[in-house]
Amino acid sequence: MEIGEAVGRYEQAAALLPSRWQQAARRVPEHRKAQAEEFRLRAGRPMTLLTCEGELLVSDELPRQSVTQADLEQLCDAVTGYSRYAAAETMGKGYLIGRGGFRIGLCGTVAVRGDGGTALRDISSAVVRISRQIRGLWQEVPEWSAGGFDSTLIAAPPGGGKTTLLRDMIATLSNGTEDRCPLRVGVVDERGELAGMYRGVPQLDVGCHTDVLDGCPKALGIPMLLRSANPQVIAVDEITEAADILAMTAAANCGVKLLATIHAEDGEELRRKPLFRQLTEAGVFRRLITISTAEGRRHYRTEAL
């Protein structure tokens, strides 16, 4: 992503903030805006900016000013367009998706309803993720589609770039390249981080031939896509449960290719995970991409499974 585009995404995210914090965010140096990953607002404490250097105060001029609960309420109103009722379901799951595809994680007091659902009130903190589109990132991955695309698993630690790479691969498969035809891609976007759907429209580029199930658990969404969208590829973010593997195995048995991510610090940790052992035993994936970071740069390694 070009620096100007990265700064532009920062400014879009900053526009969601309460007015006094918007002003502080705009005074951040340009190079830091380009590196920013998250705004973090915690009631009773100053707002911080997460970068590769860690959490930093947004402004030295406001070191003792604290985020108030009114600030957090204003943020939620701005993101939902003053229609929290319409966003109650995702808010109860701990997040909101704003215009532009920005995901806002929320903490507060949780009330468990009789039907097992949850509601969130008395918001105590919010994390505004500055999602970025890095186009052409797939070209840095060695031989990920050599001989044609095959089912691929991406592994990296939290914040290691899995979702960004996954999104670019989805768009690339969906749009096609000079030497590859476009494929129909189905995405189960359980937490709204891949497509950033806002009122039914993807705010992030996931390709021209992509169908998205938003806010749906992977184990439910994968068979739904098989029935409704006739995909050639199904993509999901963050495999966490055995039920996810069962659904992906069923899709693979129907001839569908899979593209997914999983948390792991490195290949050694990945191979110790029971979920990974289940995946290899099921034979769902044919390629593994691991992402590591050294000296501020990400490195990609591809191997056969």
Task: Please report, for each region that a protein language model flagged, where it lies by residue.
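N-terminal accessory targeting/assembly segments
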Residues: M1-G100, N175
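P-loop NTP-binding catalytic core
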Residues: R84-F149
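Conserved P-loop NTPase
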Residues: R113, T118-R121, R286-L305
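Hydrophobic anchor at the beta1->P-loop junction of P-loop NTPases
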Residues: I154
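Conserved lysine of the Walker
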Residues: K162
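Hydrophobic positions on the alpha1 helix immediately C-terminal to the Walker A/P-loop
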Residues: L165, M169
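P-loop NTPase switch/communication element
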Residues: S174-P223
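Conserved P-loop NTPase nucleotide-binding/switch module
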Residues: A229-L288, T293
